[in-house]
Amino acid sequence: MLTYKTFKILGREILIGVVWEEKIQGIAYSLDGLEFLKDQLSRVTSHLKSRGVKVNLLEEKSRYPDLVFDVLKGKIGNEKGFEELSLEGLTRFEIKVYSWLVKNVKRGEVITYGKVAKALKTSPIAVGGAMKRNPYPIIVPCHRVVGKNNPWLYTPKPSYKKFLLEVEGWIS
């Protein structure tokens, strides 16, 4: 199923789209209107399908966009949101990275790819790849992972990463 909804925060509109069945299969968001959201949802669903996840894009109401927005606002924590994710189609490594990130990097904090890699005994490039493939942005806060020399790596739009960090109070 697919549900999307428009919200306002910091004087801007954010559209949040969620693909779901029993639990959340994928999330996309847009600060640039419905067409960009549809492009992002297409990217997420293609990725899920390539991993063998059955996706139904029939539009139906659900509470999931509100849940994602509540995580963004800090009304509920990322760990609570993480419980609502299906984790279908993820590798063991991706689950390990996403779980660690949700538990260890809190709202308003950032961490480098290198530090995540060190904590998980892997390479920064492997961590970056997992962040790039993250089908659950906002709940799995890949925006909190930054490059040592370039904080805006692995994001479709650097302005989006900046916006999420601004909402969380890291950038003022």
From Swiss-Prot:
One GO CC annotation: cytoplasm
Biological processes annotated in GO: DNA repair; methylation
EC number: 2.1.1.63
GO molecular function terms noted in the UniProt entry: methylated-DNA-[protein]-cysteine S-methyltransferase activity
Active site: 142
Residue intervals passing through the bilayer: none
Catalysed conversion reaction: a 6-O-methyl-2'-deoxyguanosine in DNA + L-cysteinyl-[protein] = S-methyl-L-cysteinyl-[protein] + a 2'-deoxyguanosine in DNA; a 4-O-methyl-thymidine in DNA + L-cysteinyl-[protein] = a thymidine in DNA + S-methyl-L-cysteinyl-[protein]
Source domain of life: Archaea
Pfam assignment, any one: DNA_binding_1
Keyword DNA damage appears in the UniProt entry: yes
Keywords tagged on the record: Cytoplasm, DNA damage, DNA repair, Methyltransferase, Transferase
Location of the protein in the cell: Cytoplasm
Coiled-coil positions: none
More about this protein: This enzyme catalyzes only one turnover and therefore is not strictly catalytic. According to one definition, an enzyme is a biocatalyst that acts repeatedly and over many reaction cycles.
Protein family per UniProt: Belongs to the MGMT family.
Biological function: Involved in the cellular defense against the biological effects of O6-methylguanine (O6-MeG) and O4-methylthymine (O4-MeT) in DNA. Repairs the methylated nucleobase in DNA by stoichiometrically transferring the methyl group to a cysteine residue in the enzyme. This is a suicide reaction: the enzyme is irreversibly inactivated.
Protein known as: Methylated-DNA--protein-cysteine methyltransferase
Species the sequence originates in: Pyrococcus horikoshii (strain ATCC 700860 / DSM 12428 / JCM 9974 / NBRC 100139 / OT-3)
